[in-house]
Amino acid sequence: MITIFIAICTSTCLNLLLQFVNAHYTYNVALILLIVEISKLLLCLIGMLCISRQRNCPVRFGFIVNSVLYAVVNYLSHYITKTIPVSIYSVLIQHKLVWIVFFSILILKKSFTKQQYCALIAVCSGCILTKMTDDSMGDVAKRQMSTGLLLIALQGICSSLSSVWIEKMMKVTERPLISENYNKLYWFLADSFQMYLFAIPIYATSYVLGFGAPVITTLSLEATIIVILLSILNGMILGAVFVYHSSVIRSIIAAIVIVILAIEHNIYSIPIISGIGLVLLGVIGWTI
C-alpha cells in the first residue's frame, strides 16, 4: 500500500507541475524525456553495483516488445492529436483499461471476480465522465473521427499490451527490482533518443519560420532539475507498482490521479461529479 500511496502522490505532483510549466514556460519536451531516461538508467546501474552488489546483469531481450510498443504509442499520440481534438482523445483513450484486463487474462492467465469486473467498469466509466468537457462533443469531420477512433483503439491496444508485458517481464523471475528496471530502461532509452531526433526538425523549422519562437519565459535550470527529478522518482515508483502489484493497479492509480486533478481544478459539472463518484466507487469495490 505504501508503494501505491507514493505512486499516487508523485503522479499527482508531476501532473500539477507539468500543467503549470506548460502554461507559463517553453522547453524541449523530447530533450527532457531523454535526460530522464538516461538518469533512470544510470541510477539503476549505480543501484546494481552499490546496493545489490550485482556485477553481471544479462540483457533481457523480451523488453524489446515494450520498446516497440512504446514507440508506436508515442507516434500515434502525435498523429491522433493532429487528427481530432485533444478533449475527445483524452476521453476515448480511457477505454484502455478494458484492454489491460483482457491482456491480463490472456497473457498472465489472471482471473477476476464479478465484483472486480464491476469495479473496473465503474473506474473506466468514471474516467471517461471525468475527462469529458463541453468541447469534447464539438463537431468533427466524419472521416477524421472514424480514422481517429481506429487509431485510438490501436493505441489503447498497444499501450495496454505494453503495460501487461512489462508486468510479465518484471515478474517472470525472482530478480532484484533495480536490475529489472535497468533492463526495461535499457531498451526504452532507444525510443527516447529516437523521439528527441524526431523532435529536432520540428523545433528547427518553427524557429526558422518564426512562429515557434517562445512567447513565454524559457524554463529555468532550477525548474528543469525539479521536473527531471520528479519524473525520475515517478518512473521508478511506477516500475515498483508493476513488480509488487499489477498493471490493473497501475491503471487504477492513474484513475485516482485523474479524480484528484479534477477536484483540484474546481470545475464541477454533472458528468465530472458522476465520474468522480464512479471512480471512487470502483476503487472501493476493488479493495474490499
Regions from the PLM with identified roles:
Residues 1-288:
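Polytopic endomembrane small-metabolite transporters, centered on the Drug/Metabolite Transporter
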